[in-house]
């Protein structure tokens, strides 16, 4: 059984999808044992508590350097014997030490069809604003393995979502979450936990 940590920075809607998927038995080879938030007080921590999952806060602001933050995060993950890491709206960049320690065992969900609207500066509503400004007809979500390149790791799963007339960044964001992210992320986690 793979021990999974989910890293979050906000409300934790993707975390909720992962926890509910696990509760339905859709990841028989993995168990979420830790939620790490990038700041205190985020609703994702309450979601973790509601499912009886231990949580921790590792905030980049509390460390003098990126290397110190990386070391602290790695220490928390290793102290909990974590095998697989999920970035579910985690807005801090992982450093080389964490990536090296969990090579091919870190997955990220990105709210676009990579290689479109990805890389530095493309996160949250900014992705959907860019998609609408460009006038794309399809957007979606991608789950990929994490490497040293921002949004550059091997793609595991993608799902397209149609852009509707009158969409705002907020309505598009919600539809991409419901129709793509919440479907793909649990499937990708099950794949990684099964060593697929």
Residue ranges: model-predicted function:
Residues 84, 88-195:
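Donor/substrate-binding cores of folate-linked one-carbon enzymes
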Residues 28-68:
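Short, surface-exposed acidic-centric catalytic microdomains
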Residues 1-43:
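N-terminal Rossmann-like dinucleotide-binding module
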Residues 43, 72-73, 94:
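Short acidic active-site motifs
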Residues 68-74, 123-127:
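Charged helix-capping and loop-helix junction motifs
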């Amino acid at each position: 059984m793979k021990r999974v940590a989910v890293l979050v920075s906000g409300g934790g809607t993707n975390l909720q999808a992962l926890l509910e998927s696990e509760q339905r038995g859709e990841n028989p080879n993995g168990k979420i044992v830790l939620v790490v938030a990038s700041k205190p007080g985020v609703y994702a921590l309450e979601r973790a508590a509601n499912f009886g999952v231990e949580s921790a806060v590792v905030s980049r602001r509390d460390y003098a350097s990126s290397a110190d933050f990386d070391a602290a995060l790695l220490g928390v993950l290793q102290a909990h014997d974590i095998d697989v890491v999920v970035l579910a709206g985690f807005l801090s960049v992982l450093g080389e030490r964490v990536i090296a320690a969990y090579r091919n065992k870190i997955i990220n969900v990105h709210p676009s069809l990579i290689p479109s609207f990805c890389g530095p500066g493309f996160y949250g509503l900014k992705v959907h604003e860019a998609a609408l400004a460009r006038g794309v007809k399809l957007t979606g979500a991608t789950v990929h393995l994490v490497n040293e390149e921002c949004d550059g790791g091997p793609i595991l799963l993608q799902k397209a979502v149609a852009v509707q007339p009158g969409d705002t960044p907020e309505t598009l964001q919600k539809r991409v979450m419901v129709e793509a992210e919440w479907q793909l992320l649990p499937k990708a986690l099950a794949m990684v936990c099964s060593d697929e």
